Amino acid sequence: MNSISNDKSWKYSNFIENKYFNFDRNKIFSVLSKKEIDGAYKVISNWEGYSSTPLENLNKLSSELGIKNIFYKDESKRFNLKSFKALGGAYAVEKISHNKKKITVSTATAGNHGRSVAWGAQRLGLDCKIFISEFVSENRAEAMRNFGAEVFRVKGNYDNSLKECIKQSNKNEWEIIQDVAWERYELVPKLTMAGYAVM
């Protein structure tokens, strides 16, 4: 087997360059504060089954590439979701539904975010409606159904599924739990990012 560094398809110099190495970390906290992240941790760490996930050192790969360390955060077993986005959507569901009568939550997704929203709704006994494009695999749709979500397949791509989610949610007074922001829709994506930050 060839090593990665000998494989001509890898653009080695571009691969290891990090154009954002000197980014201003304080800019992150101007959008999402440490207090908000700490609040997410306080809630999520009290969920049944919560535990830290491992940070793996990919020694062989870092050695082959001549990089001191490459770390991989293994989120695959978090709450049995098999998703790297396990925390964000579920946290947003909990925060948005707090102190409200029984609500229905909705989202558009290609899979991972929807799985988190579906699981978050299931653990709180809420109805969940998920909109996916025609290109999302049936395995992903089934994974969301397994957490109690009703899944709607929409003709077209992700953008089409998001438009349909917004349309149906407005019509039926469902709470949209989306991981992207738009004008006058920033709170839920911010809560989702706070959940991701717990990773």
Model-inferred region functions:
Residues 1-199:
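PLP-dependent amino-acid enzyme catalytic core
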